[in-house]
């Protein structure tokens, strides 16, 4: 499927998305965090000016915080804090949807790595906490809100995953299973992950008949280098549009969630998201509906264990300078698992 010349030629059923390859920041004070927030607010305005038909602008993971992995309270955010309020107001002012990244204060443990989707009226439509922090590098609390989906612009259904989440095929499958036709993936990845980034963005799309829109931070903060690499993938796994390494570029594409929904209903061959739960429906009525996967049974029973479990070397963050944790996982009050 064509990209509509980067969304310049918008179809009646099209959703135009911009992926902002934001220059990598390095804030260490509340004032610096606020200055970076204002830069993102300015990029929301740029998105609207540069493409009047754009429906959604997506910012990468770490777009406010940078890659320092600092958990300092002065650079943590909250849903009702000034940074989030400024981002919401920017969406309302410019009548555009936005996807944003915050490092969220957590009084019960380490901060969460959280993502928000805000509509064009400034309302939060989706709130997600990263399920799979990039261990052993990242110190964030494992997410406890599940994988939500929300109604998006122009009849789309959106899901959001963050960076390392996308390396687990179960994440994208859950998004699709809950109805998402467009999955957003925000990241701070650096160049060594480039190949894995591309193939997982493609496989996540193809195996679930879902369009994916993914973007990393870009450029250098003097220590770390992020790669940009914005990428749109169609539901058949083909790349529709992609960016390079130019910081602050907004890469745009028109997606067609209506064609995703059509494929999910009408495809026979490689309708994998359906066939996964209806094995061999040519031979048996409705297909086999059982669960033959040992790891699924074990994970749900709390006994997930690999044959080589005792030999795994890295099982905490000590190799990256973090103290070994002493507490067990406990969902925060009010979470879906509490």
Swiss-Prot record:
Any GO molecular function: N-carbamoylputrescine amidase activity
This enzyme's EC code(s): 3.5.1.49
Domain CN hydrolase: 15-257
Gene3D superfamilies linked to this entry: Carbon-nitrogen hydrolase
Reactions listed under catalytic activity: formamide + H2O = formate + NH4(+)
Domain of life assignment: Bacteria
Protein's UniProt name: Formamidase
């Amino acid at each position: 499927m064509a990209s509509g010349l980067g969304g310049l030629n918008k179809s009646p059923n099209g959703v135009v998305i911009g992926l902002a390859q934001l220059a990598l920041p390095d804030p260490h004070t509340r004032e610096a965090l606020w200055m970076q927030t204002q830069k993102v607010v300015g990029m929301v305005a740029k998105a609207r000016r540069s493409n009047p038909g754009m429906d959604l602008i997506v910012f990468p993971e770490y777009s406010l915080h940078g890659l320092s992995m600092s958990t300092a309270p002065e650079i943590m955010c909250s849903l009702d804090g000034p940074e989030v309020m400024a981002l919401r107001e920017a969406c309302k002012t410019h009548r555009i949807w936005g996807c944003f990244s915050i490092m969220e204060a957590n009084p019960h443990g380490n901060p969460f790595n959280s993502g928000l989707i805000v509509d064009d009226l400034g309302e939060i439509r989706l709130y997600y906490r990263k399920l799979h922090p990039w261990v052993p590098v990242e110190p964030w609390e494992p997410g406890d809100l599940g994988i939500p989906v929300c109604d998006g612009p122009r009849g789309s259904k959106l899901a959001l995953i963050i960076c390392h989440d996308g390396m687990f095929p179960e994440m994208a499958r859950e998004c699709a299973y809950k109805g998402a036709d467009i999955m957003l993936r925000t990241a701070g990845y650096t160049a060594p992950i480039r190949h894995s980034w591309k193939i997982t963005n493609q496989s996540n799309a193809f195996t679930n008949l879902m369009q994916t829109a993914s973007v990393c931070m870009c450029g250098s903060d003097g220590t770390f280098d992020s790669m940009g690499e914005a990428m749109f993938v169609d539901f058949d796994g083909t790349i529709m549009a992609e960016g390079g390494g130019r910081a602050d570029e907004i890469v745009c594409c028109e997606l067609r969630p209506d064609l995703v929904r059509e494929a999910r209903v009408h495809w026979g061959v490689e309708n994998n998201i359906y066939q996964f739960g209806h094995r061999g429906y040519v031979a048996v009525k409705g297909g086999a509906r059982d669960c033959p996967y040992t790891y699924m049974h074990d994970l749900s029973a709390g006994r997930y264990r690999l044959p080589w479990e005792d030999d795994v070397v890295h099982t905490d963050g000590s190799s990256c300078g973090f103290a070994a944790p002493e507490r067990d996982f406990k969902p925060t009050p009010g979470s879906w698992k509490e």
